[in-house]
């Protein structure tokens, strides 16, 4: 019998994680969704219609206290609650084993533990965490232990960068590196200019600007590949596209290699131990070609360049929504397999 799972926060990632689970035949059974800021009818609407990923292929109806979803002849009744305090969400009453914490509001160990006060056994945070252990599927997920009850899937950018970084570091060694992600618009940005805390540029209109921004993705990679600590950092440019982002990793290598040798190493990993996580393309692709791409990172052999045999710029694409949501599900299922 499939494990019982809950979702807290029915935003971009919460909804897409549910879509991924449904597309896979619901290998973990979502029994409760909590979101205090949206009605059940509105939940059904934003789940059914998606500007980026298209209309849901089944039916979804908002009823009193639940969503009724039908897909491929299967009917799924999912209870809905609207608690602001995670400790008050009826996870225990619903026998929820793992909560997918996708609200973005409870990303520390202390805050995530509130879900456990509500009766959940484990919490999977769908964002980087300041103190919870972080795992990138395909890179270090095998180190997740059964007794780790709060853990993070890191960020979409970390999930793109880490597999590529692992291949390059394992094969050639990275002396130091700088990462830039050219990142699509996200929900935290503004449609028109407005105030934005200390990072004033983040408050500028998303559709009309390229916005330099900070990112913890490179630092998070050093949490999953500790030997790179102090040797890798990065930044972000937010750009006015709806979805799909791209990582530029500029690195100094320990072992000299031609660009062709680097491409061969990545292709070998993409067809081997990182198959399904890391992809490889040598075609003339652009960002929209990767909408709906389930892999974490697709290396673009045509886009990268080498200055010499020890200084290279490598490029890898990712669907920052769908690819990341697939890894959330993979890490969820892996955690449920541990005893």
Swiss-Prot record:
Keyword Membrane: no
Annotated EC: 1.2.1.12
Keyword Manganese: no
Lineage: Eukaryota, Amoebozoa, Evosea, Archamoebae, Mastigamoebida
GO biological process: glucose metabolic process; glycolytic process
Name of this protein: Glyceraldehyde-3-phosphate dehydrogenase
Entry similarity comment: Belongs to the glyceraldehyde-3-phosphate dehydrogenase family.
Catalytic reaction list: D-glyceraldehyde 3-phosphate + phosphate + NAD(+) = (2R)-3-phospho-glyceroyl phosphate + NADH + H(+)
